Structure formats: C-alpha cells, structure tokens
C-alpha cells in the first residue's frame, strides 16, 4: 500500500469540498479521482475552484475541462458527477475508495452510508455527527479501527479546542471550563436580514453584526476526550470576517500552575507529539495572519491571561476553512494505515 495513492472522492463542492480538493491536489500521498455536486455545471465548478476570495487563485497546475464529465488538473483527470441521491453515485467506477461527505446534509450514519452502496469503502463526514464516531487528529485518531466505515472529522472549532484542552488536561487537569469562539462568517448566514426559523439571530445580516450563536464544539470535546465529558461547554459569536476564527478557553485547573508554566507546556507539545496540529506563537498576531495556516490550533501566548494559579484564559487561533480541510485529508491518510 506504501506506493499506492489513496483515492478520494468528494461529495458537495462547497467551501470545505473545494478546499479539501485543493489540499488533496497539493499532496503526494493522496489523489482526487471524483467530485459530485448536482447543483453546479462542470464549467461553473472549474470557475469556483480556480478563484477563491479568501485563499486566492489556484496556481498549482492548469485546470481544464476535458468534457462534461471530466476535469483535467494538469494531466490528471478527475471524474465529475451531478447526482442528487448519494446511493446512485458510482464511486467504485471512478475508483474512489474514500469519500469526503461535505454537503452538510448527510451527516448521520444512515445517510452517509448511502455512499457505500456506490462502492465507496469509507466515508469521512466533514461535520460533527450525532451518531458517527468522531475523530480529531492529534487527539483520538489512534482509536480508529479499520472496521469503522463511516466517521466524522468533528467541527473546525472542536479541532481547534481539543488539542489545546488535551495538553492542559494531561499536564494540569481541567476541573471545568467554558469556551467562546469568535467565529468568521460561514455559508449558512445571510448577507442581509432574512428568514432563519431555527435560529432567529442567525438570520440577521452577517457583515454588520456580532451574532451570538450556539455551538456543540465544546461538548463534542467530551466525545473525543472522554476524561473531559461534562466538563466543558461553550458558545459562539459570529463576526464579520470571512475566514479565521479564535477560541477563548477559560478553565479551572486541578493543579496550580503559573501562566509561564502553561505556556511552556503548550510550547513543548507544539514541538513534539502535536507538531503540525498545535502551534505556538508569541508574536503580536491578528486574524488575517492565519489565513492558509494548515494547523488546527495556534496558541497565542500573549493574548491569554491568568487570574490566579488555578483560573486561566487561553486563546488559540484557527483557519476554520483551511486547517480543517487539511485535517480531513490527514484523517483519511491515518485510516488507510489502520
């Protein structure tokens, strides 16, 4: 298996679908073989892939349309489907072993299992799932067993919070904690005030409001780190930035520690086991400094603060699009070796 590239198909060519495609096409250990999206033409798909308001133009190889069913990335053909029902997508025909389910619609096990009928061997849901096992790379991916066919990569915020919470809990113990994420705009929000029956505040104009919102990200940490189950919860503020978000984790510690000791522990882990997942900075950074950062969580040593040696606020940045999309691919690579 060492030399054989892992063949990936993507269902849903939205923000995460397109960025997972970008990540895959820039790596040597994986290969993009198929994309399915019933709502866009092949021509429009190339345009959406080529131009990106946040991450810039695609510059890695020329993108051409071979025919209605095939895109060429340089010389590499990628099959395009436009099928609504996931059961009917012929993944096996295209050679896709792993399917990234990034429509945001088929997030539970039953719905995601439809991809297996078309010949996919494994499905990774790029969203939290109420019943599929959730994995956060750097935290609990070692618990993946090869008989699991449908898994979730959790949420971008859980991917930011969990590595940080793991380090703090392993080193100092967490009694309890509250998280706030100051989160960039996502596709579910509205450009101007509009109807949003499930979340009235969420229907307000995204580009000129700070919008309080719910998030399951902190509670989900308890699913990937059972030791923290019931110890964390949190909420979100949606703010008018297009990408990059920041987690503010306020925790009560079991073991007394100075802020410097906490910084040292996080720095050590960021250079050790969690290298490439958890970052550490002492620079005077702001959100745009992290656009295109492929780490899950970058601890901002200067932004955090301790009230006492057992009560501390920790701040960690994440590119909620690019970092997360990078982890989706990392998880697939990990699964292929299990």
From Swiss-Prot:
This is Glyceraldehyde-3-phosphate dehydrogenase GAPC1, cytosolic. Belongs to the glyceraldehyde-3-phosphate dehydrogenase family. Inhibition by oxidized glutathione (GSSG), S-nitrosoglutathione (GSNO), hydrogen peroxide and sodium nitroprusside (SNP). The active site is at residue 156. S-glutathionylation at Cys-156 in the presence of oxidized glutathione (GSSG). S-nitrosylation in the presence of S-nitrosoglutathione (GSNO) or sodium nitroprusside (SNP). These reactions may be both a protective mechanism against irreversible oxidation and a mean to store inhibited enzyme in a recoverable form. Glutathionylation is reversed by both glutaredoxins and thioredoxins in vitro. One of its GO terms (cellular component) is mitochondrion. D-glyceraldehyde 3-phosphate binds at residues 155-157, 186, 215-216, 238. It comes from Arabidopsis thaliana (Mouse-ear cress). Disruption phenotype: Delayed growth, small siliques with defects in fertility, and alterations of seed and fruit development. Reduced respiratory rates, pyruvate levels and Krebs cycle intermediates. Increased reactive oxygen species levels. The double mutant gapc1 gapc2 has an impaired ability to enhance heat tolerance of seedlings and to promote the expression of heat-inducible genes. NAD(+) binds at residues 15-16, 37, 84, 320.
């Amino acid at each position: 298996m060492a030399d054989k590239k892992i063949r990936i198909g993507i269902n849903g060519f939205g923000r995460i679908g397109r960025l997972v495609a970008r990540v895959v096409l820039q790596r040597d250990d994986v290969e993009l073989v198929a994309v399915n999206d019933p709502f866009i033409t092949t021509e429009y798909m190339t345009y959406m892939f080529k131009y990106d308001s946040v991450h810039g133009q695609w510059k890695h190889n020329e993108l051409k349309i071979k025919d209605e069913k095939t895109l060429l990335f340089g010389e590499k053909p990628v099959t395009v489907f436009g099928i609504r029902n996931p059961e009917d997508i012929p993944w096996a025909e295209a050679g896709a072993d792993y399917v990234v389910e990034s429509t945001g619609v088929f997030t539970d096990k039953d719905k995601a299992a439809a991809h297996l009928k078309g010949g996919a061997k494994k499905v990774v849901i790029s969203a939290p799932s109420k019943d599929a096992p959730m994995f956060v790379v750097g935290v609990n991916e070692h618990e993946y067993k090869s008989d699991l066919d449908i898994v979730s990569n959790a949420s971008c915020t859980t991917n930011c919070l969990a590595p940080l919470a793991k380090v703090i809990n392993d080193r100092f113990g967490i009694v309890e904690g509250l998280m706030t994420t100051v989160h960039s705009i996502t596709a579910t929000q509205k450009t101007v005030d509009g109807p949003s029956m499930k979340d009235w505040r969420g229907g307000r104009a995204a580009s000129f409001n700070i919008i309080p919102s719910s998030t399951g990200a902190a509670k989900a940490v308890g699913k990937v780190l059972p030791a923290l189950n019931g110890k964390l919860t949190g909420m979100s503020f949606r703010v008018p930035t297009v990408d990059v978000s920041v987690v503010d984790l306020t925790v009560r510690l079991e073991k007394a520690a100075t802020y410097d000791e906490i910084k040292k522990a996080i720095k050590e882990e960021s250079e050790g086991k969690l290298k490439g997942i958890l970052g550490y900075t002492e620079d005077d950074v702001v959100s745009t400094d992290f656009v295109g950062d492929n780490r899950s969580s970058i601890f901002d040593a200067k932004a955090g603060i301790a009230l006492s040696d057992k009560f501390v606020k920790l701040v960690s940045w994440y590119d909620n699009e690019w970092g997360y999309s990078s982890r989706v691919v990392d998880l697939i690579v990990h699964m292929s070796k299990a």
